[in-house]
Amino acid sequence: MALYCIGDIQGCHDAFERLLHRVDFSASRDTLYILGDLVNRGPESDKVLRTCMAAGDSMRALLGNHDLHLLAAAQGVRRSSRRDTLARVLDAPDRDQLLDWLRHQPLARSHRMAHGEELLMVHAGVLPQWSSQEVMALAGEVHSVLRSKQLPDFLQAMYGNQPDRWSPDLQGWERLRVIVNALTRLRFCTAQGVMDFDSTESAEQAAPGLMPWFDVPGRATASATIAFGHWSTLGHISRPDLVALDTGCVWGGCLSMMRFGDHLADRELIQVDCPQAQAPG
């Protein structure tokens, strides 16, 4: 059995298939965690979703901002932009099955290794105040609403940059919006955990007072290894507490997968080149 994590696929099904073939992935033997943004900007989002659905529990996805955007567009609460490539899902004969599968995916996952090490997985980031247990619990609050009859109302209320910081006293849509923004959109924040959504540059280009979320001193998840995607200008990072796997497949970069051994320190990076589906900007 092999354990893998893969970065943002974003509808690039051909690259996804080539990477699965490269590692000889077996649904009966291996486990693949998909770090969000399965869809959008690439040409074949529908095929990506079908491949993941067909694999059952061997492919375990979590939701990114583009996946939530697809759900919002499908509910009619958000219009597709000129850069979106969601029509193949929205017009698919199995649209309802694809969307139902997607809405049942969580915003965070945790994998406990045989020796007790924890691999925590999110699409974008976590706030410095949150422990691993809190990340999973807060993600679960959103997961419950996504599967409920409140889905259209939640998707309507999900958009916005405020509140820009966490408080355990937050309630209702504001509470869920902060959770969603941290887990699916976060790149930079202050040392106090105030989120910034204007900067999308690499970590070295942070504005004064801002830092990558994973470099905040005293981060409560520091004892876990966190795998994430979302940040293509960051590129691949591998350090004891961190695995960054968005390497810009949709922009003509590569699709990246990490294979873990018996310990989280045992890692092998596997990549395939991607044709450019869209230009950045």
From Swiss-Prot:
Its EC number is 3.6.1.41. Keywords: Hydrolase. InterPro entries: ApaH, Calcineurin-like_PHP_ApaH, Metallo-depent_PP-like. The keyword DNA-binding does not apply. It catalyses: P(1),P(4)-bis(5'-adenosyl) tetraphosphate + H2O = 2 ADP + 2 H(+). Pfam families: Metallophos. It is an enzyme of class 3 (hydrolase). It comes from the Bacteria. One of its GO terms (molecular function) is bis(5'-nucleosyl)-tetraphosphatase (symmetrical) activity. The keyword DNA-binding does not apply. Hydrolyzes diadenosine 5',5'''-P1,P4-tetraphosphate to yield ADP. Belongs to the Ap4A hydrolase family. This is Bis(5'-nucleosyl)-tetraphosphatase, symmetrical.
